[in-house]
């Protein structure tokens, strides 16, 4: 978005063809590189902000579907990609440039300990990911359940440091595939289910988590927004809470300014809320 003339330019053309994208989630900014996972094409896209306006510039796309993977989110860790998805070998997969995949860490504790790993992966499918600037730890916040998972990064494997659950889930699991070819919903959320995290931002010392705390009954399709920022240290201890005036969908942190910027979109009006720490 150009604030001077009000024009909007697509960084990635819409579509399923080469060099195009469909549905982007979990956008991250690392230096001059903006990255996001394309849920539609299962590719990880990276855009150089210093070059994107150059005629003929093309973002970098990396497919994550090799080795029969079904990814749902991803983030870069140095020269490797870390993804979550419908994985039964472990909650996290680190993919190396060589093409080798390493899975690690069990799924968080569920309300029903008898669930299969496939149902657990569906239950914890929608996540927002963030990596500590030193690349030593990962924060994974679940959008549906309010579960914050913090892991230490050891080479190509992860070790869980802490697991924070804010509220119990109000869900039903479909353990058997129905007859016919109808759409299958393995996890059904109650209208009273309290939704979890909308977005993450991190610093060397803290994890800033934008929290929804909303239900489908009260907010319908606006459950992916929140007015609360919960601050945790990298061991998972709650440090403080900030309240925002407007419901926001995403946040970012500026280390240079020690400031959080939150994006609010209410009543067809977009606004950047500034929170000086």
Located regions from the model:
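Repeated scaffold domains used in trafficking and secretory/extracellular systems
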Residues: 19-28, 65-78, 124-128, 195-199, ...
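Beta-propeller blade signature
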Residues: 92-99, 222-237, 274-277
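Conserved blade-ending motifs and adjacent loop-strand segments that build the rim/top face
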Residues: 12, 19-21, 65, 165-182, ...
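Loop/turn-rich, solvent-exposed surfaces of beta-rich toroidal or solenoidal domains
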Residues: 189-231
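Short coil/turn segments that connect the beta-strands within blades of beta-propeller domains
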Residues: 30-32, 78-80, 134-136, 204-207, ...
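Blade-loop segments of beta-propeller domains
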Residues: 4-35, 39-40, 60-65, 117-118, ...
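Asp-box/WD-like beta-propeller blade repeats and closely related beta-sheet repeat scaffolds
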Residues: 39-84, 110
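Flexible internal linker/loop segments at domain or repeat junctions
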Residues: 157-199
